[in-house]
Regions:
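Feature of Fe-S/electron-transfer and energy-metabolism proteins
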Residues: 1-546
Length: 546
């Protein structure tokens, strides 16, 4: 059924897609009317249940949020900072309680106190002078430093930047793919999958229509590196997508940008317009015979769309449920066509690889983790911000030298988002910023976002927060995740609020079921931080179990 829906959705192509039409139908009243959804179902020759199922999933289109006027961030960094209750109290002076909703991570983890109003994000001291009639968000201000400058290198202007593209287009796709292979770059979105393998698989598919998708739905609380690249280095991302298109034979690049990053949408669109003005988009670019264009899809608020197949379903206007694999997207992706899905930071790294060569890139980092990595530090650090470091850099250097240590006592850090490991402070000296170091020690590097858990923050409260997040954001397709995350939240909530003792054997069975039975890394990944907490903070947690 899903395959048929993909075909039906693809009949009108990217420029007239169902997902955007559902979003447009929600603008006036906060949610699409029944009549609008039925009309779209008829237009795209799909069932009415399909359009309703899609609209009822997203934060910005679902019925229960239609009266929301302002959204408070409930991401992990903001929760740990302990400022959101004060922000909510101040917002209640301007809005009724039923007009205040929540969103998970606005990318303001470096100063917290974040909220979203009327298409803009606010944080820090913004709440102190917030006025509905004339809101003025301050310009984001955080540290951006590099020990090895690649991703954070200054932008040299359109002409200089894209002279490299013109040179690259004179080479064969095999030559360029070989440079990607030699670089040994692995995906920066969390999984660490070899990028060249994905590109080659798509290249080898025989199909006249292919797509490159930039997964800019960075939803991991604590991570704002993709936001930085989209707002400050958009042409690095666009360049990477164009090279991917040339190598694989794709003519469309789709940027799926999360709704929680509204400013980024406008900045990336401006960058695309600059390319068009300079005749670097469309047919036969620079006389090379290469055709390529971009389409921005603005997401509507769903963390699960960071999973590549849920993202593809979302673009098609389907409910963003995870697909079973195989077939993989490189064979059957968007509209059932061969598709490459890469993370923002992964695509941005392509510029350096093409400019300096794959061998030069591979000299950076460790044996299996090459290149550089952006690391995000939250507001508990004396120097919060984004730091570009070479893979293999000691975590202690990131924390103590670059980050300047902690402002207040911290007992652990969650690194790599809500599905990343919980690293106790005493383990910092044993880790380095690379995939293998974290995996060998029972953690996950993921996006390399670092959220601090203060000493006075209950670890059981933290586990409740993780389960609440996982349950709310589950796509609901597989039973282990849909039911297991909900059950985990119920157990931890009761333990925190009702003097309830959790059966440890039952809890362990729940974690094993989630890990082994879930269809994707959402349900399968949430047991990792829970198990880390049980291992390293047993003394604090043991009284909650029998």
């Amino acid at each position: 059924m899903s395959k048929n829906l993909s075909e039906l959705s693809g009949r009108k192509g990217l420029t007239n897609n169902l997902f955007e039409k559902i979003g447009e139908a929600a603008k006036e009243n906060g949610t699409p009317t029944t009549e609008a959804l039925e009309k779209l179902a008829n237009e795209f020759i799909i069932g009415k249940a399909n359009t309703y199922g899609t609209a009822s999933f997203y934060d910005f289109t679902k019925e229960e949020n239609k009266d929301k006027k302002i959204y408070l961030c409930n991401g992990t960094a903001c929760v740990c900072a302990g400022k959101q209750d004060d922000v909510k109290n101040k917002l209640e002076k301007h809005f009724n309680i039923n007009e205040i909703g929540h969103m998970t991570c606005l990318g303001r983890c470096y100063e917290n106190a974040a909220f979203h109003y009327n298409g803009k994000n606010y944080s820090g001291n913004d709440i102190s002078h917030f006025q509905i009639s004339n809101p003025k968000p301050q310009i984001p201000n955080y540290n951006i430093k590099s020990t090895t400058e690649l991703l954070t290198a200054p932008f040299g202007g359109i002409e200089k930047h894209y002279s490299l593209l013109k040179t690259a287009l004179k080479k064969s796709s095999d030559e360029l793919l070989n440079e990607i292979k030699k670089s040994n770059i692995r995906g920066r979105g969390g999984a660490g999958f070899p990028m060249a393998f994905k590109w080659e698989a798509c290249k080898n598919e025989k199909n006249d229509t292919k797509f490159i998708i930039c997964n800019a739905d960075e939803g991991d609380p604590g991570a704002y590196s993709d936001l930085y690249l989209l707002e400050n280095r958009p042409h690095s991302v666009l360049f990477g997508m164009m090279i991917a298109g040339f190598i694989t034979g794709a003519e469309w690049g789709v940027l799926y940008i999360r709704a929680e990053y509204p400013e980024a949408v406008g900045i990336v669109q401006k960058a695309i317009d600059e390319l068009r003005t300079n005749n670097l988009l469309g047919n036969n670019i620079d006389g090379s015979g290469f055709n390529f264009d971009f389409k921005i899809i603005k997401a509507q608020g769903a963390y699960i769309c960071g999973e590549e197949t849920a993202l593809i379903n979302s673009i098609e206007g389907q409910r963003p449920e995870v697909r079973t694999r195989p077939p993989f997207p490189t064979k059957q992706g968007l509209f059932n066509k061969p598709t490459v899905v890469n993370n923002v930071e992964t695509l941005a790294a392509v510029y350096s690889i093409i400019k300096k060569g794959g061998d030069a890139y591979a000299k950076l980092g460790t044996e299996k983790s090459k290149g550089t990595k952006l690391v995000c530090l939250d507001s508990f650090f004396n120097n919060p911000g984004i730091y570009e470091v070479e893979m293999g850099t000691p975590l202690s250097k990131v924390v103590n030298e670059l980050g300047g240590g902690f402002k207040s006592p911290v007992k652990a850090m969650q690194i790599g988002g809500p599905l990343g490991g919980i690293v106790p402070i005493e383990k910092i000296k044993e880790l380095s910023i690379d995939f293998e170091s974290f995996a060998q020690n029972g953690f996950l590097l993921g996006h390399a976002s670092i959220v601090c858990i203060p000493t006075n923050f209950s670890m059981m409260k933290y586990l409740e927060h993780l389960f609440e997040f996982a349950a709310y954001e589950s796509c609901g397709k597989c039973f282990p995740c849909r039911l297991g995350t909900k059950r985990g939240h119920e157990l931890t909530s009761k333990a925190n609020n009702q003097n309830y003792k959790i059966d440890r054997n039952l809890f362990n069975d729940l974690l094993d079921t989630l890990q082994q039975g879930s269809l994707c890394a959402h349900g399968g990944g949430i047991p990792l931080p829970i198990k880390n907490a049980l291992q390293y903070f047993n003394d604090e947690l043991k009284n909650y179990f029998n």
